[in-house]
Amino acid sequence: MKYDGYIQSSDYEDLYFDIIQPNIINLNLLFAGFKPVKNKHYLELGFGMGRSLLTHAVSNEGHFVGTDFNENQVAFAKNICEQAKISNLTLYADSFEQLLERFRKMRAKGEEVSFDFIVLHGIYCWVNEENRQIILSIIKEFLREGGVVYISYNCLPGRATNMDARHIFKLYSQNENTENFDKIFSFTEKFAQLEPENTINKNILDTINTHRHSHPIYRIHEFLCDSWYLPYFSDMAETMKKLGDLNYICECVLAYHFKKFTPKQENFLAQINDVIFKEQMKDFILNKRFRYDLYGKELLKLSDKQIDDYLFYTQFVLLDYPTSHTFKDCEENLKWAYIELISRLENEDFTPKSAKTLMMGIDINQRVFFSLLINLMTLNLVGICMPNTTRKIDEVKFYNHSLLKNQKLSEEYIFACALTGGGISLDSLERAFLNHYFNENQMNLEELFERIYQNENFHFNDANNQACKDRESVFTQLSLHYKKFLRRLPILMKLEMF
């Protein structure tokens, strides 16, 4: 079943995207030289199962709104919202057209309807032209001055190599009335093997091999929807510019602000003054397949001193410890700097530290320092830390405990954190251990280990990376995992998540 070209026969994956967290967006704005967005009136278009929106609403002050026209997905998100008593979240099961009409009626009645953040992750290229125009109307009419739009999408040139395969997948699916990708891949692969050295067929085979083990639901949404819009970045930038006073700010990927090109590439790019043209040429250099764009409406440009002031007084907090392999391939001086940063964040009982405090006495320049900090964030070892209210911290604790109670033993899950304003992942073992920690009277540790051992969804390898097959070797690995959990536990408690 499809709605305006979008697949509705299956619910989308239950995924979390920290890239659309307000504090992460604001840090990207800072690195791009713009003042962060102060208020958090936030709209997500096409929120899927709602994991990101739920997490961000419960973790932040402000008001959060979202719509998705898959009623099953909205019902799932609403159920969690009601159980967790999230007070600042409004969820609609509207199409984009219905949402636009709803907002216009609300405004006509004198209600305040405008947003500081409008985000849409991945859906723009999966809906038809009519819906893309409606999305643009929502942005044009309801984005506040000083607000930002986050929009991510499949793009050219990188996706060009998937176009032929996708076309065959779609035709086979329609003709055989199937969404079974074993059959779709089998047919397409047989065709490509007729002349495997042909460039087109090589691309088809590469597409199949790349997605052979992708999540089945993702494959259906990616390749079988009626609309598969593939713009170049410059096309998207031109589209957004036509909305009026909406300018490209940066790619909303923290590590991209520190992206290094070769000297030849840098020299070539240096001759291009136009921001959009230069960014497009970077996409050609990198063969970009997917973009995460930020556009701003009359944002305030900061001076270098103002940027430094904001950055150096931004606080960061430890989220987890690195493993023995995390910095294995780093240069020695960088390895030392990473370890020193982790040590400083660990000091004073894991109290959040400003960038200025963390950098003090470390003999590296500012750009390298922030690139190291961002790398630690990318590894989910460090998080940005913003002050929050007692009310929000209490809401987060209630939300997280409700997740602990309701999820299956073997599920990895995203928990909310009011200090970071976003989600923190706990793997299935950490979640099981945490549940035991709060309910120790219900089961002793050996009983928990036995329960995990009997669960077919858990698999363990020994120190030689061989599968553990007997009870004793599994219990040995569980003991090691439990020690690791006990080391992380004080961090989780300091984050006031539970």
Predicted segment positions?
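Rossmann-like AdoMet/SAM-dependent catalytic core
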Residues: 204-374, 379-446, 450, 455, ...
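Conserved SAM-binding loop of SAM-dependent methyltransferases across substrates and taxa
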Residues: 49-61
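A short glycine-rich, Lys/Arg-flanked "PGG" loop and its adjoining helix->strand segment in the class I
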Residues: 133-145
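Conserved SAM-binding motif I beta-strand of class I
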Residues: 63-68
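Conserved SAM-binding strand-loop segment of SAM-dependent methyltransferases
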Residues: 85-98
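Conserved SAM-binding loop
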Residues: 77-78
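Conserved alpha-helix/loop element of class I SAM-dependent methyltransferases that forms part
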Residues: 10-40
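Conserved beta-strand signature within the Rossmann-like core of class I S-adenosyl-L-methionine
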Residues: 146-154
